[in-house]
Design a protein with these regions (language model features):
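Short sequence/structural segments immediately N-terminal
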Residues: 87, 95, 155, 175
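Gly-rich Lys/Arg/Thr-decorated short loops/hinges at beta-loop-alpha junctions or inter-strand turns
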Residues: 108-116, 139-148, 187, 205, ...
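Short flexible coil/turn linkers enriched for glycine and charged/polar residues
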Residues: 111-114, 127, 158, 204, ...
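N-terminal [4Fe-4S]-dependent radical SAM core
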Residues: 89-118, 135-136
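Residue-level recognition of alpha-helix initiation/capping sites
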Residues: 124, 155, 171, 201, ...
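Iron-sulfur cluster-binding cysteine motifs and their immediate structural context
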Residues: 126-151, 159-196, 201, 205-220, ...
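Iron-sulfur-associated redox domains of electron-transfer enzymes in respiratory
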Residues: 1-79, 84, 217-507
Length: 507
């Protein structure tokens, strides 16, 4: 639903804005404010969306807790919304797993999957639906002449739906489960959505595909602002997918000016880290494939790499050991600014999971999504479209580095680095987007179908510009990123001034 302003986006934006306002108003009691906010966000005597004002406020209360980085509470728990706030009210606090949470009393308990005959059935003479059903689950209502499905016999194959000339048979799936490429969502004893965290890779696709807004992730909005207010030098590292996310008129120069207005010490585009990553992966590919590894898979998408290691542990070594663009950018910032604290701002929920790794925690201090950033801008009344542009922009990455955010961009960047130094080197590439496709790609690779290949995997259908923390329509984002990438003065990743820093960063 990216690019469509729904009630869910409206509520999320209000919550992010209010959490940011709490952080800025140090004179307020955070505990008291937390208890009062559900009444501000859902005012009056009547619910706006569910016709139950108490339920709506309870849901907002849990959303507030998660936005503060606090654990989700079940409806059975009796405790204040602000319970545990003392731990969250510190800029060094980092949330604990799980990152993605189902607010059970917000869940609609949608059917997992069912095949349903609608009123569109015309009771035709042919009844092809009956003929193709492998379980004889479809019969004829002699009164109306319309088809009826015996749900006890139905195996949900959908063949009947595919042959209906009137499209009168539909296959309904729970939206969150359908979006989950890891098959990590099932039903609990009450029919509510339940996440299997042994399978979940925190891509966040369930979050953006739930029409009831019952799934939410944790945030560091509050802690980031408090770090800035404490006087620390906080640097923003903005992911390549940022173009257009804050409005069609918001240029990189305006974004930089807006970030500086919030108190950030400086702003860098993570595309410079993407350039470094492409160079490192190119060197590793030339060194290891095919002599040491049968194939090499890219490393920049954390949900993809975690999935690969969960499901194909025997081929874990085939996932590139190159540092991700986020980590490389953070290291670069801290190498030149030892006292810096780094905030990664991007499209991705899984980057929050990556930043929780022990090896990354010292590099990346906070992770925010583009959507969460809009709440911070709103809280400080920063008008991004009309702010005076900073001519410095956000740095000078290559075209290939900026194209990391779109399908095929990562692999192409690596190939271009290799081709620049080894023009006769053949590099075969295969890529997949969406975890279902990624799983199939890796399965085929482990069976020997992609010998000597460079594999690019991206967990989100539509790649980074379609991440869980984005707001702009996906096609529009793809176009925006492509146009911005073409403006770079460097084509390939190995041409940028930052490449000379790589050896220092990966030692």
């Amino acid at each position: 639903m990216r690019g469509v302003e729904t009630r869910i986006q409206e509520i999320r934006h209000k919550i992010f804005t209010e959490v940011a306002r709490m952080a800025y108003h140090t004179e307020w009691s955070v505990k008291d404010r937390m208890e009062a906010l559900p009444y501000k966000i859902i005012p009056g005597e009547k619910g706006n969306f569910r016709n139950d004002v108490f339920l709506e406020r309870a849901i907002v209360g849990e959303r507030l807790r998660l936005a503060m980085g606090l654990p989700y509470r079940s409806a059975a728990e009796h405790s204040p919304i602000s319970d545990g706030i003392e731990a969250a009210d510190k800029d060094e606090t980092y949330y604990t797993p799980p990152l993605i949470n189902v607010i059970k009393f917000a869940c609609n308990a949608c059917p997992e999957k069912r095949v349903h005959v609608t009123d569109g059935c015309q009771g035709c003479l042919a009844h092809p639906c009956m003929e193709v059903c492998p379980k004889d689950a479809i019969s004829l209502d002699r009164t109306t002449g319309k088809s009826v499905i015996d749900q006890e016999k139905c195996i949900k194959c959908g063949r009947c739906a595919s042959v209906c000339s009137y499209n009168a048979i539909i296959v309904q799936e729970r939206p969150c489960a359908k979006a989950c490429g890891m098959d990590a969502i099932s039903s609990d004893e009450n029919g509510k959505a339940n996440i299997d965290y042994d399978k979940c890779v925190s891509c966040g696709q369930c979050l953006v595909n739930c029409p009831f807004g019952a799934i939410a992730d944790k945030s560091q909005i509050f802690q980031t602002i408090r770090a800035i207010q404490s006087g620390e030098k906080v640097y923003a590292a903005v992911a390549p997918a940022f173009v257009g996310q804050f409005g069609p008129k918001v240029t990189p120069g305006k974004l930089r000016a807006a970030m500086k207005a919030l108190g950030f010490a400086d702003v860098f585009e993570v595309a410079i880290g993407a350039d470094l990553c492409a160079k490192q992966e190119a060197e590793d590919f030339l060194k290891e494939v095919p002599d040491e590894l049968p194939f090499m898979a890219t490393s920049c998408c954390p949900a993809w790499s975690v999935m690969a290691k969960k499901l194909f542990p025997e081929h874990a070594k085939c996932i590139s050991m190159a540092l991700t663009p986020m980590t490389l950018t953070a290291r670069l910032i801290k190498q030149h600014n030892p006292d810096a604290r780094v905030v990664f701002i991007g499209p991705c929920a899984a980057k929050k999971l990556e930043a929780m790794r022990r090896s990354v925690r010292s590099e990346v201090d906070f992770v925010l999504t583009f959507e969460e950033m809009t709440g911070i801008f709103s809280a400080k009344h920063v008008d991004l479209e009309n702010i005076k542009e900073d001519p410095a922009g956000v740095s000078d990455a290559s075209t290939d580095g900026r194209n990391f955010a779109v399908a095929g961009g990562v692999a192409q960047a690596v190939v271009n680095v290799i081709k620049r130094d080894h023009p006769d080197q053949e590099v075969k590439v295969a890529n997949a987007e969406g975890l279902k496709e990624c799983r199939q790609l890796l399965k085929l690779a482990t069976l020997g179908k992609y010998p000597g290949y460079l594999l690019e995997g991206m967990a989100c259908p539509g790649v980074c510009v379609a991440g869980a923390g984005t707001m702009q329509a996906i096609k529009k984002s793809q176009t925006s990123v492509g146009l911005y990438a073409k403006q770079s003065t460097h084509k390939t990743s190995s041409e940028t001034e930052y490449i000379k820093e790589l050896d220092k960063l990966v030692d």
